[in-house]
Amino acid sequence: MQQLTDQSKELDFKSETYKDAYSRINAIVIEGEQEAHENYITLAQLLPESHDELIRLSKMESRHKKGFEACGRNLAVTPDLQFAKEFFSGLHQNFQTAAAEGKVVTCLLIQSLIIECFAIAAYNIYIPVADDFARKITEGVVKEEYSHLNFGEVWLKEHFAESKAELELANRQNLPIVWKMLNQVEGDAHTMAMEKDALVEDFMIQYGEALSNIGFSTRDIMRLSAYGLIGA
């Protein structure tokens, strides 16, 4: 952590190199929050008994998006939103397909586990090397993301027995996509003093803990995590 903090002091947040990388990373977090906003609205339709809670989560994601848009404006950076839409296209399409088929378990794994863990990992690694304005915004966001992760964990734990097979299939289909996403931004993340290995480690810790909380054994988690290597 100290090493990263020292690196942040050396970063020139106004340099064209940094701002170029930031235009894509900032777009990814903006689009990620927009995806989450829309996904929770869809989940509210699929889970009417949890409608109000899911709409509350969707509104929080929209608020997060506005915060990250302000981070871009603070550095005079225009986010590359087209890049970000393509970046999320794999998970986006899989979520839409699952929702159309009424596969709530798959939708929850994609949004409430994979996307939330991806976001938490990215924010955890970014905070020590962020500019002061973005650090304050991101610290506030990451605290709320844990509550979003918790919703998925609680629901899936309560329905674990009947959900396990679908969870395993959804994991196999979607975890490799995360690895491809991480590979895609490795260069830009490095420019911003965020190392891919640290992002992978934090993601796997968050994701493994979530799977454990749902009810998977340690052996199960190791097996499920190995599917990510397919996309490495």
From Swiss-Prot:
Keywords: Iron, Lyase, Metal-binding, NADP. Its EC number is 4.1.99.5. It comes from the Bacteria. Fe cation 1 binds at residues 33, 61, 64. Signal peptide: none annotated. Pfam families: Ald_deCOase. Coiled coil: none annotated. InterPro entries: Ald_deCOase (IPR022612), Ferritin-like (IPR012347), Ferritin-like_SF (IPR009078). It catalyses: a long-chain fatty aldehyde + 2 NADPH + O2 + H(+) = a long-chain alkane + formate + 2 NADP(+) + H2O. It is an enzyme of class 4 (lyase). GO terms for molecular function: aldehyde oxygenase (deformylating) activity; transition metal ion binding. Fe cation 2 binds at residues 61, 116, 148. Binds 2 metal cations per subunit. The catalytic dinuclear metal-binding site could be either a di-iron or a manganese-iron cofactor. Belongs to the aldehyde decarbonylase family. Catalyzes the decarbonylation of fatty aldehydes to alkanes. Involved in the biosynthesis of alkanes, mainly heptadecane and pentadecane. Requires the presence of ferredoxin, ferredoxin reductase and NADPH for in vitro decarbonylase activity. This is Aldehyde decarbonylase.
